[in-house]
A protein has these predicted regions:
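Iron-sulfur cluster-binding electron-transfer modules in prokaryotic oxidoreductases
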Residues: 1-288
């Protein structure tokens, strides 16, 4: 595969064809885990990236027969356990926050996409009655910052809805009703750029502190440089951006490495050799 993508990049261009650089995550499972609308405490919009990429094989190879195979499976399970079941609409396919279009400069496409998604969210949330949970911090941030691309009715709808990142959902709505069993020794956090913008880093640290005896946030844990698809197109950007953090992660020798954005997790896994995953997997495992 590396040879094929290298040839394609040479022929078509490095801005259009991603470089195959292992470890690459496997594809996500087809379809979403079953959920029901009656009695749901929130609408769950799985981010596109978590509908594309599945869980790393390292996360599934830890000798845990109950390990969820996808982030939606894990979030659905732990929400139900906390007595706050979430509902994934059956027509969720095709919904997107619009961030990929914005990042590429396709402003008309971004406006069309986010207006369509806000209309869907308004319908799914019963006119804003239910909060909406999103499982990737960049997507949460993108949707919350989308007002300028919305028409007037949809801008009002977005303002009337409660949009929650999975970090806030877990810290404020799930954790108080969960019982943590045996804690791990240490958890290493990578705070994302969008999580920083949303003010979620403290809540992520609070979640980690409930699950681990020691929480480590490397001093050099700033932007991972993956920036959507840039890390696929130019992996050297992410490698350079994470070099300092990678050395500190190695010294920390953590038992788990957690984050809240899939592409950041891919970049950090490549940089450190450690399996970075959404914090939701650890929360689900330690509260069974």
């Amino acid at each position: 595969m590396a040879g094929i993508t290298a040839a394609a990049r040479a022929a078509i261009g490095a801005e259009l064809v991603p470089e195959w650089e292992p470890p690459m995550p496997p594809p996500a499972k087809a379809g979403m885990p079953p959920t029901v609308q009656p009695g749901a405490a929130a609408v769950y919009l799985p981010a596109c990236v978590n509908r594309i990429f599945g869980r790393d094989t390292e996360g599934l190879a830890a000798g845990d027969p109950l390990a969820p195979g996808s982030l939606p499976e894990a979030l659905v399970a732990v929400s139900l356990r906390a007595g706050k079941p979430v509902w994934i609409p059956t027509d969720v396919a095709g919904s997107c926050c619009g961030t990929p279009w914005v990042s590429k400069g396709y402003r008309d496409g971004a406006a069309w996409m986010v207006n369509s998604t806000v209309e869907d969210l308004w319908r799914w949330s019963d006119g804003g009655r239910l909060p909406v949970v999103i499982d990737a911090s960049s997507c949460t941030h993108g949707l919350l910052e989308a007002a300028e691309r919305l028409n007037a009715p949809n801008a009002e709808r977005l303002a009337a809805m409660t949009i929650l990142d999975s970090v806030a959902w877990a810290a404020d709505h799930l954790l108080p009703d969960l019982e943590v069993g045996e804690r791990i020794g240490s958890a290493v956090i990578h705070p994302t750029c969008s999580g920083t913008h949303l003010g979620l880093n403290g809540e992520l640290e609070r979640l980690a502190a409930a699950l681990a005896d020691e929480v480590v946030v490397p001093d050099e844990a700033t932007c991972c440089g993956f920036a959507g698809d840039r890390g696929f197109l130019h992996p050297e950007l992410s490698a350079s951006a994470t070099a300092g953090e990678a050395s500190q992660v190695a010294a920390a020798n953590g038992d788990a490495h957690i984050c809240a954005n899939r592409t950041c997790e891919i970049g950090l896994t490549r940089a450190t050799g450690e399996s970075y995953e959404s914090f939701v997997y650890l929360l689900e495992r330690l509260t069974r």
